[in-house]
Amino acid sequence: MASQRVFPLSCVVQQYAWGKMGSNSEVACLLASSDPLAQISEDKPYAELWMGTHPRGDAKILDNHISQKTLGQWIAENQDCLGSKVKNTFNGKLPFLFKVLSVETALSIQAHPNKELAEKLHLQAPQHYPDDNHKPEMAIALTSFQGLCGFRPVEEIVTFLKKVPEFQLLIGDEAAAQLRESMSSDTQAVVSALRSCFSHLMRSEKKMVVEQLNLLVKRISQQVSAGNSMEDICGELLLQLHQQYPGDIGCFAIYFLNLLTLKPGEAMFLEANVPHAYLKGDCVECMACSDNTVRAGLTPKFIDVPTLCEMLSYTPSPSKDRLFPPTKSQEDPYLSIYDPPVPDFTVMKMEVSGGCGMCSMINLARIAMRNSPEAGSPFCQTHLVGCNHRTHPFLCTGTRCGKADESLTSVGGGSRTVTHCPQSCPQPGS
């Protein structure tokens, strides 16, 4: 592999309040493993590690042979590193943002807009919606990872309406009846009824929400103290969210949204307009390069209930359908590929057996090119390189090719490394 170039990156850490504290955070551990000078404060949260070129977290290049630049600046000056297809498709920019998240307390009830809505929201309120790009994203668990994702089957929601009168009261009798009747109707009737119920909940008066939530918390707490299980109404989760966000309407969202607990390596893909919330655990997250989020609960940040209720996809599905399983590479037994139906990124997980060191960057680049999409097509890939001690994130973007003018850029997380191969790429089996 000719003319390879390797240089380290300093990647941005976001210390949002919901992050895990100090060295309990995988984000903090990755930061410390890559920077011997990093000082980890045990009383501060380390929520997200950003690897990419987004303006809010553009990685910095650490190389004495290169004048001080961010990764975004360097790519702007060296666009051929993306490969011609990615360069042309995404206007010479890195199309994805890769993160590691360490979640201690719940993130907001949220969704991300499609491209058309993102442009509209950015034009109307750039202070709240800083990007004009869509934000499809994938979360892959590093540890046991809990989250809410997509609307539950209507049958489950109707069951909660029966068992949780406080929930039923906020929805209202008319909307609840409409939802029950939709169970024997067509898909459009279900979508309409679900939209009506969810909108009624999210637009409930604050005073009524607090009253009903306090009643529900008291009832669950009494039953738990008496030794009774409240699992059938997600009692433990309700108490947990209420403790984190007292009186918040988002606590009731658990009765609308699927609850998923991902095992390490399991993933969920969140396309545009899918409601979701991360609750607890560590994950890697890859997304289109955007920071647009429409929120409506479980957050002290700006909420936009009208936009969220209008934009959401109200198609219900069982929780198992929200899982996004990887496919095994046919050419390499160590690779698993998470390939969502968007052009912005693909995630590849490499599990290295034996030893505890990472495989070489050059060999990983070879594997990336060998397992990328068909010749001539753009690809944007994220690799998770597993060893005995830690999973190391490693990013690639480029073009699957047989031409000498194509290229591969790789951005490493755990090792903060960029590999650049500007002249040629290996062929399968090389």
Regions found by a protein language model. Give the residues of each.
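Intrinsically disordered, low-complexity basic segments at termini and long loops, enriched
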Residues: I40, S377, G412-S430
